[in-house]
């Protein structure tokens, strides 16, 4: 976890795998960051088999209320993830990304 990190109430870090969080990251209420997933095969799932994939959150990122960040995702520096978004794939730096599945709708200019 980097400097000047803030996570609001009811946030969840499901960290069986590694979560890396940069500097100046703000996480709103009810955000979930998940690093593990269950096997798709029913027999393996019943045996409790899980896989983990790291999550990386860059510097100056804001993740808005109720967003879910799924295993293996990287969110690039200076990006904003909209409220209620489900981040299933990497988000490039300087992006405003929203929706389910989350997609980039605009590039953010840095001042």
Q: Residue ranges of each PLM-predicted region?
A:
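Conserved active-site beta-strand element of glycosyltransferases/polysaccharide synthases
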Residues: 97
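Helix-turn-helix DNA-binding module
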Residues: 76
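Gly/Pro- and small hydrophobic-enriched strand-loop and loop-to-helix capping segments
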Residues: 88-94, 111
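Short beta-to-alpha loop/turn elements within the nucleotide-binding domains of ABC transporters
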Residues: 73, 84-85, 91, 100
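Flexible, glycine/small-residue-enriched loop-and-beta-strand segment within the central core
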Residues: 1-73, 100-101, 106-109
């Amino acid at each position: 976890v980097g400097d000047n990190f803030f996570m609001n109430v009811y946030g969840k870090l499901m960290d069986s795998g590694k979560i890396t969080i940069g500097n100046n990251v703000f996480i709103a209420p009810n955000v979930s960051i998940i690093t593990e997933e269950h096997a798709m095969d029913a027999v393996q799932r019943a045996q409790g088999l899980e896989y983990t994939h790291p999550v990386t959150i860059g510097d100056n990122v804001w993740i808005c209320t109720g967003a879910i960040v799924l295993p293996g995702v990287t969110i690039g520096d200076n990006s904003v993830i909209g409220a209620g978004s489900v981040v299933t794939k990497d988000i490039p730096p300087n992006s405003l990304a929203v929706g389910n599945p989350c997609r980039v709708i605009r590039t953010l200019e840095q001042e």
